[in-house]
């Protein structure tokens, strides 16, 4: 699958310039494809993270008619059985980072994990969608740091005293759930060269 993509342009489905910047920075200049951001209105599917990622990727392929990379991110609170999970966008929109923190006010367990899933398609609907996942464990804290990138101000990864929002970009990009998923993607493309 990936061999047919080497040297080609892949549409990265996002309207978020910061997300594209972060992805390109993590992948580096050795990534064998060119990512081009395109904002596409995709339905907000419901279900498990893998199902949602596959459905989003298939719909993006239908609209783009070519190779696509779609990202879906979850923030899962252990005390809430994994919620908000794939619905974090809606929780964040209504509650902001402070409200996410307050959701756990009645719980001792503040642990959480961030899950990033990238879904890749060659653009051929008959070929399977390939998934790449990254997970970072941490805890939900009172928001600290810059408030301009989603829930970063209230997620503190395990082993760190800073939230994602307080970390220098390079440090965050070396430990984030997105980094781990993109590392899987890089390894997949790298295995073709071996």
UniProtKB/Swiss-Prot annotation:
<comment type="subunit">
    <text>Homodimer.</text>
</comment>
<keyword id="KW-0547">Nucleotide-binding</keyword>
<dbReference type="GO" id="GO:0051276">
    <property type="term" value="P:chromosome organization"/>
</dbReference>
<keyword id="KW-0460">Magnesium</keyword>
<keyword id="KW-0378">Hydrolase</keyword>
<keyword id="KW-0007">Acetylation</keyword>
<dbReference type="InterPro" id="IPR029001">
    <property type="entry name" value="ITPase-like_fam"/>
</dbReference>
<dbReference type="GO" id="GO:0036220">
    <property type="term" value="F:ITP diphosphatase activity"/>
</dbReference>
<dbReference type="GO" id="GO:0036222">
    <property type="term" value="F:XTP diphosphatase activity"/>
</dbReference>
<dbReference type="InterPro" id="IPR027502">
    <property type="entry name" value="ITPase"/>
</dbReference>
<dbReference type="GO" id="GO:0000166">
    <property type="term" value="F:nucleotide binding"/>
</dbReference>
<dbReference type="GO" id="GO:0046872">
    <property type="term" value="F:metal ion binding"/>
</dbReference>
<dbReference type="GO" id="GO:0009204">
    <property type="term" value="P:deoxyribonucleoside triphosphate catabolic process"/>
</dbReference>
<protein>
    <recommendedName>
        <fullName>Inosine triphosphate pyrophosphatase</fullName>
        <ecNumber>3.6.1.66</ecNumber>
    </recommendedName>
</protein>
<feature type="binding site">
    <location>
        <begin position="72"/>
        <end position="73"/>
    </location>
    <ligand>
        <name>ITP</name>
    </ligand>
</feature>
<feature type="binding site">
    <location>
        <begin position="177"/>
        <end position="178"/>
    </location>
    <ligand>
        <name>ITP</name>
    </ligand>
</feature>
<dbReference type="GO" id="GO:0005654">
    <property type="term" value="C:nucleoplasm"/>
</dbReference>
<keyword id="KW-0225">Disease variant</keyword>
<dbReference type="GO" id="GO:0005829">
    <property type="term" value="C:cytosol"/>
</dbReference>
<feature type="binding site">
    <location>
        <position position="89"/>
    </location>
    <ligand>
        <name>ITP</name>
    </ligand>
</feature>
<dbReference type="GO" id="GO:0035870">
    <property type="term" value="F:dITP diphosphatase activity"/>
</dbReference>
<dbReference type="GO" id="GO:0006193">
    <property type="term" value="P:ITP catabolic process"/>
</dbReference>
<dbReference type="GO" id="GO:0043231">
    <property type="term" value="C:intracellular membrane-bounded organelle"/>
</dbReference>
<feature type="binding site">
    <location>
        <begin position="149"/>
        <end position="152"/>
    </location>
    <ligand>
        <name>ITP</name>
    </ligand>
</feature>
<feature type="modified residue" description="N-acetylalanine">
    <location>
        <position position="2"/>
    </location>
</feature>
<dbReference type="GO" id="GO:0042802">
    <property type="term" value="F:identical protein binding"/>
</dbReference>
<dbReference type="GO" id="GO:0009143">
    <property type="term" value="P:nucleoside triphosphate catabolic process"/>
</dbReference>
<comment type="function">
    <text>Pyrophosphatase that hydrolyzes the non-canonical purine nucleotides inosine triphosphate (ITP), deoxyinosine triphosphate (dITP) as well as 2'-deoxy-N-6-hydroxylaminopurine triphosphate (dHAPTP) and xanthosine 5'-triphosphate (XTP) to their respective monophosphate derivatives. The enzyme does not distinguish between the deoxy- and ribose forms. Probably excludes non-canonical purines from RNA and DNA precursor pools, thus preventing their incorporation into RNA and DNA and avoiding chromosomal lesions.</text>
</comment>
<keyword id="KW-0546">Nucleotide metabolism</keyword>
<dbReference type="Pfam" id="PF01725">
    <property type="entry name" value="Ham1p_like"/>
</dbReference>
<feature type="binding site">
    <location>
        <position position="56"/>
    </location>
    <ligand>
        <name>ITP</name>
    </ligand>
</feature>
<comment type="similarity">
    <text>Belongs to the HAM1 NTPase family.</text>
</comment>
<feature type="binding site">
    <location>
        <position position="44"/>
    </location>
    <ligand>
        <name>Mg(2+)</name>
    </ligand>
</feature>
<feature type="binding site">
    <location>
        <begin position="14"/>
        <end position="19"/>
    </location>
    <ligand>
        <name>ITP</name>
    </ligand>
</feature>
<dbReference type="GO" id="GO:0005737">
    <property type="term" value="C:cytoplasm"/>
</dbReference>
<keyword id="KW-0479">Metal-binding</keyword>
<dbReference type="InterPro" id="IPR002637">
    <property type="entry name" value="RdgB/HAM1"/>
</dbReference>
<dbReference type="GO" id="GO:0047429">
    <property type="term" value="F:nucleoside triphosphate diphosphatase activity"/>
</dbReference>
<keyword id="KW-0963">Cytoplasm</keyword>
<keyword id="KW-0887">Epilepsy</keyword>
<feature type="binding site">
    <location>
        <position position="172"/>
    </location>
    <ligand>
        <name>ITP</name>
    </ligand>
</feature>
């Amino acid at each position: 699958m990936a061999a047919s993509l080497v040297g080609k342009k892949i549409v990265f489905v996002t309207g978020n310039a910061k997300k594209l910047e972060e992805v390109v920075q993590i992948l580096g200049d050795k990534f064998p494809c060119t990512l081009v951001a395109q904002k596409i209105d995709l339905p907000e599917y419901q279900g498990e993270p893998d199902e949602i990622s596959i459905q989003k990727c298939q719909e993006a392929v239908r609209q783009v008619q070519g190779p696509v990379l779609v990202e879906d991110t979850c923030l899962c609170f252990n005390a809430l059985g994994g919620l908000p999970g794939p619905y974090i966008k809606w929780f964040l929109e209504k509650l902001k980072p402070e409200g996410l923190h307050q959701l756990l006010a009645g719980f001792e367990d503040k642990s959480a994990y961030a899950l990033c899933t990238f879904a890749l398609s060659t653009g051929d609907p008959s070929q399977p969608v390939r998934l790449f996942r990254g997970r970072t464990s941490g805890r939900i804290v009172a928001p600290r740091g810059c408030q301009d990138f989603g829930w970063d101000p209230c997620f503190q990864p395990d082993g760190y005293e800073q939230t994602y929002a307080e970390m220098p970009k390079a440090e965050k990009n070396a430990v984030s759930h997105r980094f781990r998923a993109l590392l899987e993607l890089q390894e997949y493309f790298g295995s073709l060269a071996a």
